[in-house]
Regions:
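Metal-cofactor-dependent catalytic cores
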Residues: 1-237
């Protein structure tokens, strides 16, 4: 095994396209990070194979903050940009999003997670820093919406490309098979705190790395991943 670096931070997104939740301890199951993308709002009647209501249609989605309640039976509550806190399955939240998006939507719960490709995503901090520098934009890892950011030893941007086809060990027990690069879209032009789209971000990714940034992976061995855990690359998957 060769050491790649360490986990810089771990995240999940309880509601697809809403704000991230930082994790000091990320439980990883065979389906991905537990409760990641567990809920999604769907555009009713959309013929698209990706019918989700996302920041592309409603940039303010990114400024809706989900959290788990402290009840005996925890549930997801969503704080809107106006400061209202609404249950994930409430008509009030659905109607709020419908008014903002100007289209009908419905809530889709999915305990396996609503993913576009694969359940686990990873990206190096070197790639994040390079994209920011090359595009002249603030360094904001969360615009890429990954589960794990890896602080790499060699600090080379796009180093994740070399992880494809290999198995990574994250911490003491978790093993993931890196299956493909992550093809990016206009979502990465949107900052997590709002503001105008920064198209230069996507331009750099398209020109330098075929519109790919970060990688997808499937879970081979479940366990727990924490910031600071070491990351190793094993033999080809």
């Amino acid at each position: 095994m060769a050491r790649v670096g360490r986990i810089a931070s771990a995240w999940r997104y309880p509601v697809k396209s809403m704000a991230a939740e930082p994790l000091e301890s990320a439980p990883v199951t065979l389906q991905g990070v537990q409760a990641d993308r567990m809920y999604a709002f769907v555009q009713a009647g959309s013929p698209s194979p990706f019918p989700w209501l996302t920041g592309r249609e409603l940039p303010a989605m990114l400024r809706h903050q989900p959290r788990w309640s402290d009840d005996q039976r925890p549930r997801v509550l969503v704080r809107t940009p106006a400061g209202d806190e609404l249950p994930i399955d409430s008509d009030d939240l659905r109607l709020h999003l419908e008014r903002a998006a100007e289209r009908p939507v419905y809530l889709l719960p999915n305990y396996r997670g609503s993913f576009d490709v694969a359940a686990i995503t990873l990206m190096s901090d070197a790639t994040v820093a390079h994209i920011a520098a090359a595009s002249g934009t603030p360094e904001e890892p969360l615009r890429f919406r990954m589960n794990f950011y890896v602080e790499t030893e060699d600090r080379q941007p796009w180093c994740e490309n070399g992880w494809v086809g290999h198995t990574l060990r994250l911490g003491d027990s978790v093993r993931v098979a890196v299956t493909e690069r992550d093809k990016r879209c206009a979502m990465i032009t949107l900052a997590p705190h709002g503001g105008d789209p920064l198209t230069r971000v996507l331009t750099v990714v398209a020109n330098e790395n075929e519109a790919m940034a970060g990688v997808y992976a499937s879970v081979l061995t479940p366990g727990v991943v924490r910031p600071g855990d070491e990351v190793f690359i094993e033999d080809p998957a």
